[in-house]
């Protein structure tokens, strides 16, 4: 009963990069979204939220079962209900660096996985930059390798927009006397 990327990879004797991780999240309005990243990559939830222009949260195991009809560990992108939006990381593009290649994915059936699944043929998701960057990745602008360094935060900016002002009905009047929600931000110096 292999559920995790590591367990499936070890059982099949293939690298994690030959698997696709399928992660169900819930966006605003209870919209189910299936995010796909290569097995050796991690989903960057903030990137997905920014792409969706929505707040997101991981689906609870009972939601996964209700929406996809299978328990966590066997979720895959093939044959998901049309109500589920499927978004794959750019690294899975069939016309990308790796090209169209076969992957192992969850089968959306208990204790089962599918092999030979090709993105673009067996599943046609939309694509976005969804994965966490890591040391050695190429810069998308110049191609130089990314280096990861230990740093100290000296300041931060949180662009809150109207997330808090709109529900609180905190408004300002424009020149014509029309109300608009206050656009908020939080700016800090130091950790």
Cite the ranges covered by each PLM segment:
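Extended, low-hydrophobicity, polar/charged segments
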Residues: 1-191
